[in-house]
Amino acid sequence: MRHYRISDQNPIKTKRLILTPLTAKELAALETLEQDELMRGALGEMRRNVVEYPDRALWHTGWQISLKKGGQAVGLLGFHGVAVEQTVELGYDIFPQYRKNGYCAEAIRALCDWAFRCEGVYFISVLV
């Protein structure tokens, strides 16, 4: 089985964006700052799964979406675990002030391209 460790993954770059997988420490920092209870719970679950399953961490962590120009974080996306029946689920959140710029579609395309190059992934379900 191929390992999907955070330390082995270079950021994914698109024309305007950089997607960077977050470490457990980074997830913990975001979790303490998050105001929304539902999102705080999701960040906590990601952090716990990254620690518990380090060889599959890229399927459990959040990927920060940042602008190439200026480095500003504009959102977060990530998978909801490893593939089940050759399918992974993908969720996302673009911060309100950055919506309607096409960042979400660009980030989803890039992360889906990465996932389809991984062994055992044939389908991706995107959760809105």
What is the meaning of each model-derived region?
Residues 102-105:
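Glycine-rich acyl-CoA binding loop
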